[in-house]
């Protein structure tokens, strides 16, 4: 078996066929994943270089991609290696292919300078090599009863599929950037997140107001609508658009996923039949010192609430990493945790005072954790 290596542009068709075989065996068509994730998979050298491929006797048997994801974390941006498309040939599972690819991806991400890695996957599958549940998202259930049935005024609104002129692109980009926690998007790539086979984006312009919504269906298909993956613009117009689309498409329930953004939560809580809060994905700390240095402005600002001085020395027991956050004169407090518990301290779902009660890390409650969130349109 060959060692994992970066894919070349000429391998685009082979890579797309392979990951379709692994991830979309029941769906018809060609280059299915390319259509569902056009912002990730493209035949140019830059995007193909993100894929690690593993061959055995000339046959592609494994794939893993590392995509750069800029995480907005309350005023700073930390770039993470977003791991996706982890695939072993169905007939070759249990041969160590995934293990080899994950090890190669770690080397690759460290070489690129990513202090973090993120992925979506099973905790038992990925936890053994350092990833842990992290981040925070709220999923709201919207029904015609909770949201209110579409009125004549709602049904009269001029909805249309989102158009991609330069002004609309800049407007949507600016609206999303108002959220303090999320993922960085470039203007050049923005369109690829919205125009994909797995979702449909709608806009409405009415009496000087503007709003957009993005909906999707099951199994990475656009229909039937079951998810509200993103929205922005005039709040009342957003809800009216959702009511119209639910009525026209006979939708009885929508799941709406949002991050830790007050206006989004305030908009959906009153019109939801229920909601639940859960970890947003899995996180691994690759470089603790770089992470602490990049987060320092936010951590110092949040630390002022604790009314304490001195410095904090973070230590990761498994990997032996250390980092110091200097907060002023005074003693050094040492917080030593396992690698996965350090993820929980920095990005976990629950307050540090609850998870680490009776331990030094509990004193950082209020400064940590940070509510990391990757919007659905930015998943890898």
Locate the predicted segments by residue.
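Short amphipathic alpha-helix that is part of the acyltransferase structural core
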Residues: 1-68, 75-78, 82, 147-188, ...
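Conserved GNAT acetyl-CoA-binding A-motif
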Residues: 102, 107-121, 249-260
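Conserved acetyl-CoA-binding loop-helix of GNAT-fold acetyltransferases
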Residues: 85-88, 94-107, 233-247
